[in-house]
Regions:
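Surface-exposed beta-strand edges and their flanking turn/coil or helix-capping segments
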Residues: 40-42, 54-57, 74-76, 111-112, ...
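Oligomerization/assembly interface segments of phage tail-like spikes and tubes
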Residues: 53-71, 112-125
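Charge-dense, low-complexity intrinsically disordered segments
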Residues: 3-7, 65, 110
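Mid-chain, well-packed structural core segment of small domains
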Residues: 67-88
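Acidic-leaning, charged glycine-interspersed low-complexity segments
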Residues: 82-131
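Small/polar-rich, solvent-exposed N-terminal microdomains that initiate assembly or binding
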Residues: 1-51, 85-93, 130
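Short, low-complexity, polar/charged sequence segments that are solvent-exposed and flexible
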Residues: 45-48, 59-63, 80-83
Length: 131
């Protein structure tokens, strides 16, 4: 049986979403010190092994913009791209992706920006281990 370990899903999503949408900057934690409108923060918040070869990853996605309308627009684009990842040719093989509806979520770390947040779950193969 081939053993696998989880991948760095924050980096995988950051890389793949940035390749699909160049109008935003995508980050994994920590929050960048120069956070600005158009930034998207992707943070793993949980997950589980779903088979001998695949893992499920729960992530939180924060979309920052200058105002509420722009934050909604940005989160709609990122949400749509994320759930479409299994249908796209990306650096990571996603077998499933779903997400809940984005919601307004004030961030005290960035009071000058509006933020929309959504949770998502993606499933993809792990990294093969050689033992």
């Amino acid at each position: 049986m081939q053993l696998v370990s989880p991948i760095d899903i924050e980096d995988a999503l950051r890389t793949d979403l940035a390749a699909l949408y160049s109008d935003a900057r995508f980050f994994a934690p920590p929050i960048p010190p120069d956070l600005k409108a158009g930034d998207v923060l992707i943070e793993r918040v949980g997950g589980a092994r779903v088979s001998g070869a695949s893992h499920e990853y729960d992530v939180s996605v924060d979309c920052y913009a200058a105002n509420d309308a722009a934050a909604v627009a940005l989160s709609d684009v990122v949400h749509g791209l994320l759930v479409s990842l299994p249908l796209r040719d990306t650096s990571t093989q996603y077998s499933a992706a779903n997400a809940n509806t984005p919601y307004s979520n004030y961030d005290p770390r960035a009071p000058q920006l509006a933020r929309q947040t959504f949770r998502a779950t993606v499933i993809c193969p792990g990294t093969r281990l050689t033992i």
